[in-house]
């Protein structure tokens, strides 16, 4: 939908609703921000290039903590490393609530481990962390699963014989198979039609959720939901994925062996059975479906997109690629696969992966938080249930913590001796009590897939390095890298 039409619809909505609701009311003692219009909120301050651009521009005038009105609802925006850490770490409990993402709210409605709140969320998060940890130990470790998948990926890339290809589908396949092995107890063949359909739905949905239309929908969901738009396609896509998950759950239920749980779904079904007499239990069918959807979506999209962006950066900066491959040769060699223990001996490669995550800036303004009580913060009072947007991008590009914030520079994560150093501005997985629960798995995947590929292949592009464009194809809730062609040449 064109911006002008969206603006017209929003303006008409404002005129109609103004007759019934009047001006936005004052809320506590919120941080300063641009004065909102009735119902329209700060629509006129929103940049056509999206919410991130809008927030960064408003930051220049109002500072690191300010309030914007998305429609009639106030949202507190946090910018910069220090403000985000003060909120999510120093006052972790107060800022531990989860806000809504309007385009997916009709699906989740506050259920599942990502969108749940209060004790429901705590119980689901504890369970999810413990279950993934248990399936990362015992039987087959997560590391072994990733190494197996990396071997399959190398075999598939060898089949290309150095021809140009788009790595999107392959990277989606390998990262998805890791979470599939933990959640569903199986991996899929890369040509499996059901698997390919699921991957297409995830890729479509991530791109649509990150689109400009979805950002406009965030301002006026109650009104725009009555019109055609990306929100309807997102709903259909996620419903189709949920149908697949539901069918898989029923197959698990029919073959469940209580003495030998095979995967996350089995363990959850056993917990459901244990709690079936408790009507207040969080462990019910709907939370199972939506928690699996969350794990599947996050476990597929975020890591695969980081890998895609990473190899685009390696094409643009071939001298970095050469240095990574030299470190791989020195530490690992060519006769065994990379292992997680190698990471501690490979500070340059680890720094490169950190810098890929930093500059890739996958989730620019993070997932929405919500304060769980009236909260004093930097001299203001944020009322209970107010949404909070931590702009992670502003930390990942914070000039106080990164010397060249807009340039690819692995030195941001290396000390004078070449050892890996911690950087307070690095928060791609967010911080605090809502930090990504798959952080450990994602970091392991990034290291093992990245090093295995560069151990076995040189890479080349039909485009000269200086002409490679890093501009995201979509930039909203997520940054979607541009499509590109790459050759994987066996070493």
UniProtKB/Swiss-Prot annotation:
- Top-level taxon of the source organism: Eukaryota
The UniProt keywords, alphabetically, are:
Endoplasmic reticulum, Heme, Iron, Membrane, Metal-binding, Microsome, Monooxygenase, Oxidoreductase, Phosphoprotein
> Record's PROSITE patterns?
CYTOCHROME_P450
Location in the cell reads:
Endoplasmic reticulum membrane; Microsome membrane
Q: Write down the required cofactor(s).
A: heme
- Any one Gene Ontology cellular component term annotated for this protein: endoplasmic reticulum membrane
What inducers act on this gene?
A: By phenobarbital.
Instruction: State what protein this is by name.
Output: Cytochrome P450 2B5
Per the UniProt record, the source organism is Oryctolagus cuniculus
Point out the gene that encodes the protein.
CYP2B5
